[in-house]
Amino acid sequence: GYLECNKGFITLGKDMGKIVKVPVFVFLIRHLEGNVLIDTGISSRFKETWGKRLNYFIPILKHNIVEYLKDIKINYIINTHLHIDHCENNPFFKDSEIIVQRKEYEIACNPKPYQRLSYPDRVDKNLNYRLINTNLDLFGDETIKIIKTPGHTEGHQSVLLNLTGKKIFIAGDSCYTSENLKNNILPGIIWNADKVMECYEMIRNLKDTLVIFGHEEAKI
């Protein structure tokens, strides 16, 4: 799907007031050890669930992910973080193991007042969460590696894929767009500016890797 929003939320201090449409991604990875979903995106119920967020962000649902994947068993979900546009469909995958950084889960369950706009109103604690505190090679074969990338949020993580010899870095919101990266522009929603810059530098140092930015159109 997409979000319509003020570009100032994407590029802090630049193009404030300009309305843009940015993509919201969900990735399905098929692996011999099981199907993996990276983020779960916006729910078809957003008109009821987003509340005052709709004053700032207008979701445009291209696909109902739950309906689209209804005949596919999802073994694992990797949430880059738990902001509402990345995890709202989590409750529909009750049989999946959801992998998230422990710090991110703890903050999402009890966000500070200034964080509440970004996180869901309620985290379903009955889901099958696997809380981690470090990087993780999901299947031990280096095909799907979870990498801690705090900055946008304290518990943010990204995913490095190495499939059929092609490396792809799913940045999530560690870096919104190539414009942010090129010009060292902070995102409009941020936990720690220094950590964001560390993420940018790490991304620049990736070799022979396609980077999929969190909110920029991409071709794989």
Predicted ranges, named:
Residues 2-4, 34, 42-45, 84-85, ...:
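Short, solvent-exposed loop/turn segments at secondary-structure junctions
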Residues 2-67, 158-172:
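Conserved beta-strand hairpin/beta-sheet module of binuclear metal-dependent hydrolase folds
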Residues 21-23, 132, 153-155:
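Residues that act as N-cap/strand-start positions at coil-to-secondary-structure junctions
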Residues 36, 78, 99, 130-132, ...:
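Hydrophobic/aromatic beta-strand patches that form the interior of the parallel beta-sheet core
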Residues 43-44, 58-85, 97, 101-150, 191-208, ...:
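Metallo-beta-lactamase
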Residues 91-94:
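Short, conserved loop/helix-junction motifs that constitute active-site signature segments
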